[in-house]
């Protein structure tokens, strides 16, 4: 039975055994060297995660791509503390154009909200990653093609437009309960 995106992702995180975790959704595709670039950048900078730009991709009526440039060249190639600027909290979550150190996710209890039938479940995951990371590295290269013409995609369902509210409620709960508790001595 399909228990939903968040629950499925959490099962994947529980089963993961490698140093890094990457996410690829079924209707998208990665550049052949995407994981090599992301892991190399994360490893060489001892980063909690490495994240890159991506392309919007259409296959109909003809194939075309458009770079979604979240990170400008000046922001790339050097380690940053992602929560030092609000810029990164405002970006499209795009959790699939990144790799995350598995021990970082586990240490911070970062998982997905397991709400069956929901959408936007990458929203709270991405927020928690940015808030908890001590070091990130951004790449200018587009490493993933994010398909825009899948009519069955949950982001194209008007019935699911309010699901993002559940994600924002989870962010608020997490800040109040988990983040505040775990970072009380950071002042």
Give the residues covered by each predicted segment:
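Tetratricopeptide repeat
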Residues: 16, 38, 168-171
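Donor-binding/catalytic cores of nucleotide-activated saccharide
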Residues: 5, 9, 26-140, 144-161
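Glycine-rich, basic loop-to-helix element that forms the pyrophosphate-binding segment
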Residues: 1-16
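C-terminal, non-catalytic tails of nucleotide-sugar-dependent glycosyltransferases
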Residues: 166-187
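Short aromatic/hydrophobic "clamp" motif used to bind/position activated sugar donors
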Residues: 21
């Amino acid at each position: 039975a399909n228990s939903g995106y968040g629950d499925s992702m959490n099962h994947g995180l529980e089963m993961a055994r490698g140093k890094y975790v990457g996410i690829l959704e079924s209707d998208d595709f990665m550049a052949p060297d995407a994981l090599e670039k992301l892991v190399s950048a994360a490893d060489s900078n001892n980063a909690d995660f490495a994240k890159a730009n991506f392309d919007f991709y259409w296959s109909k009526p003809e194939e075309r791509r458009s770079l979604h440039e979240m990170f400008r060249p000046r922001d790339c190639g050097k380690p940053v503390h992602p929560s030092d600027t609000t810029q990164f909290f405002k970006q499209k979550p795009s959790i699939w154009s990144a790799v995350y150190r598995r021990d970082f996710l586990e240490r911070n209890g970062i998982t997905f909200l397991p709400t069956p039938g929901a959408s936007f479940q990458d929203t709270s995951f991405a927020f928690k990653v940015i808030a908890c990371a001590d070091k990130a590295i951004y790449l200018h290269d587009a490493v993933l093609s994010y398909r825009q013409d899948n009519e069955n995609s949950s982001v194209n369902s008007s019935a699911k437009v309010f699901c993002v509210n559940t994600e924002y409620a989870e962010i608020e709960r997490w800040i109040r309960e988990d983040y505040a508790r775990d970072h009380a001595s950071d002042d």
